[in-house]
Design a protein with these regions (language model features):
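Beta-sheet entry/capping signal
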Residues: 26, 153-154, 200-202, 267-268, ...
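Short, flexible loop/turn elements at secondary-structure junctions
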Residues: 56, 66, 127-132, 161, ...
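Substrate-binding/active-site clefts of carbohydrate-active enzymes
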Residues: 111-118, 127-300, 304, 315-316
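Generic enzyme active-site microenvironment
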Residues: 123, 204, 270, 306-307, ...
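Conserved alpha/beta catalytic core and glycan-binding cleft of carbohydrate-active enzymes
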Residues: 286, 290-478, 558
């Protein structure tokens, strides 16, 4: 039976926190007889064990005097082995080590910060561990100036909650409240976010609420109610959001949302695989996450919540007042898939659902996503809803992201599969469209370093992960005869480290110039910045299409040629002026002369041009 809104909204404070010269604990362990706090010294030696007092709702609590922040501890349930606190705010020695009492103090300098405009985001996705050689929050701070000069206004961090070992994408997290120690822990994350705000850059946290990782997951030691057999996910039993005991499980998530926004000054969240967050109750957890995120922000500071969701479901971004969940955006990967089919020829797996034709690309651009209810051959059932009436900023588009690169067996960047000319054309379309663009780190110079799938699990689990990874790609014809890199090998991780030195070579510098100029145009051209603008798209024969953007009485045409030669005559009643073309030598192309002669546009091979019309 669904719980009431009132019951669900109560957020019990759990974990450990300092109160004056004491530390207070509160632990949820329903059905158990007792919970002890086990205190440790700096060398992991047990100092003493102190029982907590039973409280209501299956909780145990108590305060210990003469303790402060920095206290390290584990929890023992019914006299069993001590385990980390599932509500721990810090795990300095990893997910199996003692938890640490930490506060939220930081000398914040961002009182001026008002948060991001959800209709004007340019997102840059970063994996902290491979974004710099050091792989820490603070090591990325010097790169913020690069992002600001590029034209990025939003930094999206792959999950930073504590995960097993030192090498992981972050989606195996188990301690939601504890920023990864090898990244720099709570202090490093606060410094990065504060510095980002000083550069005018918002920070989104990638949050994983659809499952918990297996390594270091001690939740069942405290309560079986963290999970439910009522629903199942690709990772096993679902997290319990709608059955017995779910109030405290929901509180785990909602308190985590509050923490990122309030204690770390994060500007919002990217919700991983929201389609796998199963909740049959009312209100849906996704709606509560949005509500809680906004409530946690400082007065006047905007926050955004974006979901990764494969369903093409308009309800996600429909306002709560109209029966939706009220998210600001949703990942819409159909454009990525159409472009890869068109330029790289991908056709296996979910790519079988796409043609990459000019007509289908135009339809995707008109709608925001391609599937609006038609049957998916890959899934075997209908997919998608009609997006009519939704603002284009709700759709997050990309030509690369961590999934689309890292879930290829060799972590190949787009540069490995399409020509430099095609890369420039795809980039031009992405950044000139009315949708929210997402860039994957290094994309702005066409980085050549791979982004592989890597882990650092215990030996037994690691062996299973390695075997599973290789079986996953065994059925793909293009990968037969090649051995997929071992996720557990350190070299798999180090090979994925971004090489910022690539910016010094001429080809990379050309692409970087293209991205900077496109993003400057996106931020300054009235046709692109207008909130009253409209857009349309249509095919120009089998191998080309045009995206039209109209506002302020002007029209901007983004013409993309897939292959062959295009001769396109523009409206003879309008004056036409070339704004930019992707094959300009300044971007690494080979076409020095303008492709526009009078009102005739001539493009050869994969390329794109931006033309302004004025009647």
């Amino acid at each position: 039976m669904a719980q009431s809104t009132e019951a669900r909204s109560q957020a019990p404070r759990l974990g450990a926190w300092a109160e004056g010269s004491s530390v207070r604990w509160r632990v949820w362990a329903p059905g158990h007889k007792g919970v002890d706090v086990v205190l440790y010294d700096a060398e992991d030696r047990v100092l003493r064990k102190v029982p907590l007092t039973p409280e209501a709702d299956g909780c145990f609590g108590g305060a210990l005097p003469d303790l402060a922040e920095g206290t390290r501890y584990k929890l023992s349930v019914d006299g069993g082995d001590p385990f980390p606190d599932p509500w721990s705010r810090s795990q300095p020695q990893g997910v199996h080590g003692p938890s640490e009492v930490v506060g939220s103090d930081h000398g914040w300098t961002d009182s001026h910060w008002k948060g991001p405009d959800p209709q004007a985001l340019v997102i840059y996705e970063v994996h902290v561990g491979t974004a710099t050689p050091e792989g820490t929050f603070e090591a990325f701070i010097p790169k913020l100036a690069h992002l600001r000069e590029l034209g990025v206004n939003t930094l999206e961090l792959l999950p930073v909650a504590s995960f097993p070992g030192a090498r992981n994408w972050g989606y195996d997290g188990v301690d939601l409240f504890a920023p990864q120690a090898t990244y720099g822990g709570p202090r490093g994350l606060r410094r990065l976010i504060d510095a980002a705000h000083a550069h005018g850059i918002a920070v989104l946290i990638d949050a994983v609420y659809n499952h918990f990782g297996p390594d270091g997951n001690y939740l069942r030691a405290y309560s079986p109610h963290y999970f439910t057999g009522k629903h199942h996910t690709p990772w096993g039993d679902a997290v319990n959001y709608d059955s017995e005991g779910s109030r405290f499980v929901r509180s785990l998530v909602l308190s985590n949302v509050e923490m990122w926004i309030r204690d770390y000054h994060a500007d919002g969240l990217r919700l991983d695989a929201a389609h796998a967050i199963v909740d049959d109750g009312q209100p849906h957890l996704l709606a509560e996450i949005v509500e809680r995120a906004h409530a946690a922000s400082a007065s006047g500071r905007r926050v955004v919540v974006i979901a990764e969701d494969e369903r093409n479901e308009r309800k996600l971004v429909t306002p709560a007042s109209e029966g939706g969940y009220g998210l600001d955006g949703v990942w819409a990967d159909d454009l990525h898939h159409q472009l890869r089919r068109a330029f790289a020829g991908d056709h296996e797996g979910y790519y079988q659902d796409y043609t990459g034709s000019a007509e289908d690309l135009a339809a995707t651009l008109r709608q925001g996503w391609f599937y609006t209810g038609q049957k998916s051959r890959n899934l075997g059932h209908a997919r998608g809803t009609d997006p009519k009436g939704l603002g284009p900023w709700h759709f997050v588009h990309c030509i690369q992201n961590h999934d689309q690169v890292g879930n290829r067996p060799f972590g190949n960047r787009l540069s490995e599969d399409v020509s430099p000319a095609a890369y420039r054309a795809m980039s031009t379309l992405l950044l000139m469209s009315p949708f929210t663009p997402l860039l994957f780190m290094g994309q702005e110079w066409n980085a050549r370093t791979p982004f592989l799938y890597f882990t650092d699990h215990n030996a037994e689990l690691g062996k299973l992960v390695t075997e599973g990874r290789r079986k996953e790609f065994a059925g793909f014809s293009r990968f037969k005869g090649e051995e997929v890199p071992d996720p557990q090998a350190r070299d798999t991780f180090t090979r994925s480290t971004l090489d910022w030195g690539e910016l010094d070579n001429a080809e990379a510098a050309g692409v970087h110039t293209l991205y900077k100029e496109l993003l400057r145009l996106r931020a300054t051209e009235p046709v692109l910045t207008s909130r009253q603008g409209t857009h349309d798209a249509r095919a120009l024969g089998p191998d080309a299409f045009v995206l039209e953007r109209r506002a302020e009485g002007d029209t901007l045409l983004i013409v993309v040629n897939l292959k062959g030669s295009l001769m396109h005559t523009l409206n003879p009643r309008a004056s036409a002026g070339i704004v930019m073309w992707s094959e300009n030598p300044r971007y690494g192309g080979t076409v020095a002369a303008s492709p526009l002669t009078g009102n005739v546009l001539h493009l050869d091979g994969p390329s794109a041009a931006v033309v302004k019309l004025r009647e």
